[in-house]
């Protein structure tokens, strides 16, 4: 993980960026650093900004499940299935369904 990339993304989002990829990137940086709570808070901000940004649901759901927060992860994956269905995103839908099935 690049501390420079993290700093740039933190600056962009703190300045009120509406770019969903900036928020997604920041959440992924936090996740990669093991900062699960920061990542979750950032994913939640992204969901408030753009609930149709389907990629966040898979990444947040699997991150939470890996952190032992399986019920929270399941809820994110289920929300992602709804979002992917609404966007007719079959590829994302398949990945989300597979991830959900993997939780048991």
Spans of features found by a protein language model:
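Conserved structural position within tetratricopeptide repeats
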Residues: 11-14, 44-48, 82
